[in-house]
């Protein structure tokens, strides 16, 4: 395919036009008085959102050079979202500001490579200073503030703080759509996996269609059980003790299933069978997790263990087990606490080592089931459009909260960036163009406050000067149009989000400035086939 080429200033300006189109679409969403953007969907209703990365992902421009610029800034938003989960609008805004200021200097004859050196130097200093002013998150109140600022809702803030308090830092919090109007929180205590009973005849409560077993033995195996003779010796031992049994296996079928159901219906013996969770190697690991949590052993031929030889001390135990049609929950497994801690440490190491996002997510779930718990925030709304928008807000708030717990918090509303400007201004260089790079970052750091003020109907430049003249930590509360101590008022941003937004914006923008040529495909013209004779409708009356 033939290529189209642009060079120098023309290439950079064409790409800058694309950067501006994307950034100008995203920037209107920043701050407590930021607006929403409507995204057209080919199927279903349009999506209304203020989530920077969701908007950026939808933007494709017709002009190939403009589209290149837009895609570069889209990467800023995506990378920030991947690392910190929030701050995508801020990152986009910073990238636009660095590119705009940088191109002015490059056009005036400055060396882009030296400018990039200055930008990197300034960003390193900025990140250091952000860490200096960072404060650790202390308790539920701080968590609620971070979430409330991100979601623009105090109710959501309290909900997320409750969820994090109940499942701990190792717990998993998921956001799902609710069928009702309200937004509520459900916490699953103990270990839950998505496998239900193999036969409805095993239920102990026919109204709720669930089986609840108290003080229960748990047989864990990766084998398929079809012959009752295989498990008869262990069943006899359990019956003698008058206990109940949960069997977790690949499957229970045939004679074994019918015998267990018959004994349950006669009231001789209560047993519930469920299929093992997961598939392949993940199944083996999950069975091992259950065994460690309950103090049992996995009965597997790979480990040289046969069902006929199972003894009581090979079984796991738990205070209670609840089995529904779709889920099994084991509460208060009686496993050895030291063994559980070792297993948790092992999973943490695997999480750090894995490069796959999918594997990381699954390992995190396993960790939560062993160490913390699982909380589900169910989001409800009157319409599907509102529900999608609310769900995106809560997902952002959740990511921001996790980031805050990791690295702490800084004054919000762009105040942290303003507070570190004097430290950036102190940086010097004998090379003029490197100094220009430092100045570019100094100016770009003002941009978030300016945009938050503009979106609130105030004059951005005036607000910036007032914040600069105030004490460190005092910023502009755009919601109430006043100047306050941001940390005391609860207007905070996660340190990780603030840091990542600047680092990712500077990385892409400084590379953009060094562009000297751009290459794009020339779209092929579609050849229209010649019209068949008579198709021109000549001679029609």
From Swiss-Prot:
ATP binds at residues 29-32, 86-90, 413, 477-479, 493. Keywords: ATP-binding, Chaperone, Cytoplasm, Isomerase, Nucleotide-binding. GO terms for biological process: protein refolding. One of its GO terms (cellular component) is cytoplasm. Its EC number is 5.6.1.7. It holds the Pfam family Cpn60_TCP1. Gene3D superfamilies: GroEL (3.50.7.10), GroEL-like equatorial domain (1.10.560.10), TCP-1-like chaperonin intermediate domain (3.30.260.10). It catalyses: ATP + H2O + a folded polypeptide = ADP + phosphate + an unfolded polypeptide. InterPro entries: Chaperonin_Cpn60_CS, Cpn60/GroEL, Cpn60/GroEL/TCP-1, GroEL-like_apical_dom_sf, GROEL-like_equatorial_sf, TCP-1-like_intermed_sf. Its main location: cytoplasm. It is found in: Cytoplasm. GO terms for molecular function: ATP binding; ATP-dependent protein folding chaperone; isomerase activity; unfolded protein binding. Forms a cylinder of 14 subunits composed of two heptameric rings stacked back-to-back. Interacts with the co-chaperonin GroES. Together with its co-chaperonin GroES, plays an essential role in assisting protein folding. The GroEL-GroES system forms a nano-cage that allows encapsulation of the non-native substrate proteins and provides a physical environment optimized to promote and accelerate protein folding. Belongs to the chaperonin (HSP60) family. PANTHER family: 60 KDA HEAT SHOCK PROTEIN, MITOCHONDRIAL (PTHR45633). NCBIfam families: GroEL, PRK00013.1, PRK12849.1, PRK12850.1, PRK12851.1. This is Chaperonin GroEL. It comes from Clostridium botulinum (strain Loch Maree / Type A3).
């Amino acid at each position: 395919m033939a290529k189209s080429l642009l060079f120098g200033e023309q290439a950079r300006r064409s790409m800058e036009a694309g950067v501006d189109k994307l950034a100008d679409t995203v920037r209107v969403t920043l701050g407590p008085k930021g607006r929403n953007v409507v995204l057209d969907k080919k199927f279903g209703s349009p999506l209304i959102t203020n989530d920077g990365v969701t908007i950026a992902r939808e933007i494709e421009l017709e002009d190939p050079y403009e589209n290149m610029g837009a895609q570069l800034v889209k990467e800023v938003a995506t990378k920030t979202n991947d690392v910190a989960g929030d701050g995508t609008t801020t990152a986009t805004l910073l990238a636009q500001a660095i590119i705009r200021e940088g191109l002015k200097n490059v056009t005036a004859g400055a060396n882009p490579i030296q400018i990039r050196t200055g930008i990197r130097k300034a960003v390193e200093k900025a990140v250091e200073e952000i860490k200096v002013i960072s404060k650790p998150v202390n308790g539920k109140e701080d968590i609620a503030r971070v979430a409330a600022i991100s979601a623009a809702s105090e109710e959501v803030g309290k909900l997320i703080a409750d969820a994090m308090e109940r499942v701990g830092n190792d717990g998993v919090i998921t956001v799902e759509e609710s069928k009702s109007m309200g937004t509520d929180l459900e916490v699953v205590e103990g270990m839950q996996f998505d496998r239900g009973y193999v036969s409805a005849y095993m239920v102990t409560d026919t109204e709720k269609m669930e089986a609840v077993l108290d003080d229960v033995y748990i047989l864990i195996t990766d084998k398929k059980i079809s012959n009752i003779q295989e498990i008869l010796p262990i069943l006899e031992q359990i019956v003698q003790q008058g206990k109940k049994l949960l069997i977790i296996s690949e499957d229970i079928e045939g004679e074994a299933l019918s015998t267990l159901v018959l004994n349950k219906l006669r009231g001789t013996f209560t047993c519930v069978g469920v299929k093992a969770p997961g598939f392949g190697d993940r199944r083996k690991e999950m069975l091992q997790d259950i065994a460690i949590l309950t103090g049992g052993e996995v009965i597997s031929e790979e480990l040289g263990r046969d069902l006929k030889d199972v003894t009581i001390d090979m079984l796991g135990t738990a205070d209670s087990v609840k089995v529904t049609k779709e889920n099994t929950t084991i509460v208060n497994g009686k496993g050895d606490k030291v063994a559980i801690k070792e297993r948790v440490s092992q999973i943490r190491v695997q999480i750090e080592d894995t490069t796959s996002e999918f594997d990381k997510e699954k390992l995190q779930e396993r960790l939560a089931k062993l160490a913390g718990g699982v909380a589900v925030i169910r989001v409800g709304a009157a319409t599907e459009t509102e529900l999608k928008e609310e769900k995106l807000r809560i997902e952002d708030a959740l990511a921001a909260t996790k980031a805050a717990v990791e690295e702490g918090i800084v004054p919000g509303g762009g105040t942290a960036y303003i507070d570190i400007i004097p430290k950036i201004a102190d940086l010097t260089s004998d090379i003029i163009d490197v100094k220009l790079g430092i100045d570019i970052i100094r100016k770009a750091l003002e941009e978030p406050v300016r945009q938050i003020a503009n979106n609130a109907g105030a004059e951005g430049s005036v607000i910036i000067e007032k914040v600069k003249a105030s004490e460190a930590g005092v910023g502009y509360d755009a919601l109430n149009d006043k100047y306050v101590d941001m940390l005391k008022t609860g207007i905070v941003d996660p340190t990780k989000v603030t840091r990542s937004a600047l680092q990712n914006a500077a990385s892409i923008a400084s590379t953009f400035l060094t562009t000297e040529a751009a290459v794009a495909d020339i779209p092929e013209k579609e050849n229209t086939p010649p019209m068949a004779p008579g198709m021109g409708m000549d001679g029609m009356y």
